[in-house]
Regions:
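Hydrophobic residues in beta-strands and at strand termini
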Residues: 21-23, 71, 112
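A broad structural signal for short, well-ordered beta-strand segments within beta-sheet-rich domains
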Residues: 6-7, 63-66, 105
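Hydrophobic beta-strand-centered segment that forms part of the acyl-chain substrate-binding groove
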Residues: 50-84, 89
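Acidic, aromatic-enriched beta-alpha/helix-loop junctions
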Residues: 35-56
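Generic "edge-of-domain/loop-turn" microfeature
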Residues: 26-28, 39, 76, 90-92, ...
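Catalytic strand-loop segment that frames the active site of acyl-thioester-processing enzymes
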Residues: 2-40
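HotDog/MaoC-like acyl-thioester-processing domains
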Residues: 4-5, 12-16, 86-114
C-alpha cells in the first residue's frame, strides 16, 4: 500500500484545502525507514502534499523544488494526521503542514512552475 487512508477531505476555497489522514502500518514507505523505528520519509510527505494539491485545488503547475522544509516530529505508523494546503498562485508556491494533535509535525514551501 502506497497511499494513506483519507478519512476526510475539504476544499475551503480555490487556494486552501485540508485532509485528515491515517497512516496504516502497512504503508510501503515505512519499510526500512528505519528498522525497528519506522517513520514516514520526508520525500513522501512532500509527494503527498503535491498529489493532494493537484487533486483538491486543481493545480496544474509542475514541481520546481523545495524552498523550505522543517521536520519537527516524526510521523509514525497508525497516526492520524491533518494535512493543510495553501496555494499561492501569484507566487507559484504551495505551502503545506502536517499536524498531529494540534502540533505541527512538518511544514514546508514548494516552488512550482507552469
Amino acid at each position: 500500500m502506497m497511499q494513506p487512508e483519507v478519512l476526510q477531505q475539504q476544499r475551503d476555497d480555490a487556494t486552501h484545502a485540508s485532509l485528515q489522514l491515517r497512516l496504516p502500518a502497512g504503508l510501503l514507505w515505512f519499510r526500512g525507514h528505519f528498522p525497528g523505528h519506522p517513520i514516514l520519509p520526508g520525500v513522501t510527505q512532500i509527494n503527498w502534499a503535491m498529489q493532494y494539491a493537484h487533486q483538491l485545488l486543481g493545480i496544474e503547475a509542475a514541481f520546481k523544488g523545495v524552498e523550505v522544509v522543517k521536520f519537527q516530529q516524526p510521523l509514525l505508523p497508525e497516526q492520524q494526521v491533518r494535512l493543510l494546503l495553501e496555494w499561492q498562485p501569484e507566487r507559484g508556491k504551495l505551502l503545506f503542514s502536517y499536524r498531529v494533535g494540534g502540533a505541527t509535525a512538518s511544514s514546508g514551501k514548494i516552488a512550482l512552475c507552469r
